[in-house]
């Protein structure tokens, strides 16, 4: 997979995550919690920045988007650990019960469906940030030219 393809894929992941986030809050009327807002702060610019970089072929954009994706992943991991009961809820997450950070928001159906207990919105966010990091951190493959071809050319 070449760098252009990885850049486009990272943009598509960020775009899907942004549109999905807007769908859940604006169409399904889920109230974003403080940790969700933090993840939005890091994901939404990625959709714009990666889109522009993909269309103009700017591979130097990695130095700007990798820190955003890493910070977003940190918030997503923390929220998942909180939802799974591994860490205690932070004070900002307990103020508004309508937007509690440890609420397992269902992706489809109800929160009682088996898949929805595992595949929640915070899990999707964590996957999206991890995919963006993986796609943009993939080492560049160097093309080596054999000496015999270099001498003839």
Curated annotation (Swiss-Prot):
Main location: membrane
GO biological process per UniProt: protein folding
Paired cysteines (S-S): 33-36, 93-101
Transmembrane residue ranges: 4-23, 38-57, 64-81, 117-139
Topology of the protein relative to the lipid bilayer: Multi-pass membrane protein
Gene Ontology molecular function: any one: protein-disulfide reductase activity
Keyword presence, Cell membrane: yes
A Pfam family this chain is assigned to: DsbB
Subcellular location: Cell membrane
SUPFAM superfamilies, A to Z: DsbB-like (SSF158442)
Annotated keywords: Cell membrane, Chaperone, Disulfide bond, Electron transport, Membrane, Oxidoreductase, Redox-active center, Transmembrane, Transmembrane helix, Transport
Coiled coil segments of this chain: none
One Gene Ontology cellular component annotation held by this UniProt entry: plasma membrane
InterPro entries: DiS_bond_form_DsbB/BdbC, Disulphide_bond_form_BdbC, DsbB-like_sf
Protein's job: Required for disulfide bond formation in some proteins.
HAMAP family, per database record: BdbC
Protein family (similarity comment): Belongs to the DsbB family. BdbC subfamily.
Protein name: Probable disulfide formation protein
